[in-house]
Structure formats: structure tokens, C-alpha cells
Amino acid sequence: VDTIANRLYLRQGETLLHEAVCSTGTGGLLEEPGSGRRWVFETPHGVHRVLDKKKKPVWNKPDWAFVEEGKPIPKNPNERLDPYSLGDYALYLGGGYLIHGTLYQRLLGRSVTHGCIRLGDEDLEAIYRATPIGARVYIF
């Protein structure tokens, strides 16, 4: 994943199997008023692995999602569940970072995410089907 060009390349050895326009982290900073908690929305560079894959993933919204929206952080864990925002498929890279779909396909190619890698529907399905659990993911 090239975070400067916002491109995802699926390779097997030296062979390019698929290229997709993606969106990656903004690099922006969010600070929670009064608590001093801070989040930086960068896509983490380095070598990662696909730890899990899910169809119809449900996002367990972290605290920062509520802080960003100016809403109270829910005490009930079920109030954090969002079955819509991640798209039809997700590949889990660990640390809360995923390759997933987007509700905002017009923003693909821009650095607009909170650190995850977003893909369009067709590209996401192709990557999901072609990438096994355990595959290496290089983010640079």
C-alpha cells in the first residue's frame, strides 16, 4: 500500500495481480476536550499480516469516533456497533487497522481515513477473495 499515491498493489512475487485506488490516513490529530487524550490518524507503515477476514463486518466504534462527532462515549457496548460503515468485506491487520470498504467512494485516492485503508466495492471484493489470512501487507 502506497500511502503517498493512495494505491494498493496486490502482488504474487514480482507479478502484479491487481491495482486499486485507495484512501489512507489523514495524519490529522484529534484531542478530547478536558481529558487530554489524543489520536493521530496515520496509516501505520511497515510489514503487517492479514490476521483475519470477515464478510459483512461490524465496526466496534472506538472512543475517538464519538469524540470526533461530539457525542458522549456510550457505556453500553452495543451502542458502539456499526454494521454499515466497513462495507461488505474487511481484512484485519491488527491494532484496529483494517482494509475495508467505504460509504464515500468519491473520496478514494485521497488521504481521508482515520488510519484504515479504504477500497471501492469491486476492488475490495477482488482483494478479499485473492488474499489469504497470513498474507504480508507492506505499507509505505
Spans of model-derived segments:
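N-terminal post-signal-peptidase region of extra-cytosolic proteins
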Residues: T3-I4, A20-R38, K71-R80, D121-E122
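Conserved hydrophobic/aromatic pocket- or pore-lining residues that grip, position, or stack substrates
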Residues: L8, V50, L91
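A short, polar/proline- and glycine-enriched secondary-structure boundary/capping micro-motif
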Residues: Q12, E19-V21, L29-P33, K61-P62, ...
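Short, surface-exposed secondary-structure junctions/capping segments
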Residues: L30-K53, L119
